[in-house]
């Protein structure tokens, strides 16, 4: 193989899985809304609400690790939606990728899946992805998050980056525990 053929086969720094229409919805009116869901069982009505707010456009799940397991679940809850996609963004390189940013900018709803919030902090902070997400929130598209995905939607994030974590007793005794 030539050098250009090898370069053409280079794996992208992200993973992308899409079901439903392969063509992006356009000219969709969205309504601002936020769902902050703790860990545990997903709440069907919360996802249905986000789909309604999205104008049945393109629903995007983002995460740093994991699978596309949300895709069929959300498509079943929101059968009139244009598409459901999962974008796995596991590095700073992926968080600065043109395709990732274009996909964020084309979504009518964004959901941040649960996982390890320190991955979100390490991989996404101060990247083009971070800026694009803030822009989309300001533009008023519906957003949501589960567990760690909820955590990174807030102003302050506990990520356990500096130590192995904190117990409830330690946090109650000293909320500024480092």
Annotate each language-model stretch with its function.
Residues 1, 53, 60, 77, ...:
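Generic detector of leucine side chains in alpha-helical contexts
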Residues 8-119:
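Extended, subdomain-level signal for the structured scaffold at the beginning of enzyme domains
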Residues 121-178:
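Class I SAM-dependent methyltransferase SAM-binding "motif I" and its flanking Rossmann-like core
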């Amino acid at each position: 193989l030539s050098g250009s053929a090898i370069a053409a086969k280079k794996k992208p720094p992200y993973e992308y899985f899409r079901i439903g229409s392969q063509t992006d919805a356009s000219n969709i009116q969205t309504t601002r809304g936020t769902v902050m869901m703790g860990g545990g069982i997903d709440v069907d009505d919360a996802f249905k609400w986000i789909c309604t707010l999205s104008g049945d456009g393109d629903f995007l799940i983002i995460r740093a690790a994991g699978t596309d397991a949300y895709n069929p679940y959300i498509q079943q809850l929101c059968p009139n939606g244009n598409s459901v996609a999962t974008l796995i963004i596991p590095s700073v390189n992926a968080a600065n990728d043109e395709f990732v940013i274009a996909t964020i900018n084309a979504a009518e709803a964004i959901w941040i899946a649960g996982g390890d919030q320190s991955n979100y902090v390490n991989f996404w902070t101060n990247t083009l992805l971070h800026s694009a997400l803030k822009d989309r929130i300001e533009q008023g598209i519906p957003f949501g998050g589960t567990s760690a995905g909820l955590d990174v939607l807030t102003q302050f994030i506990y990520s356990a980056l500096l130590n192995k974590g904190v117990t409830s007793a330690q946090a109650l005794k000293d909320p500024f525990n480092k």
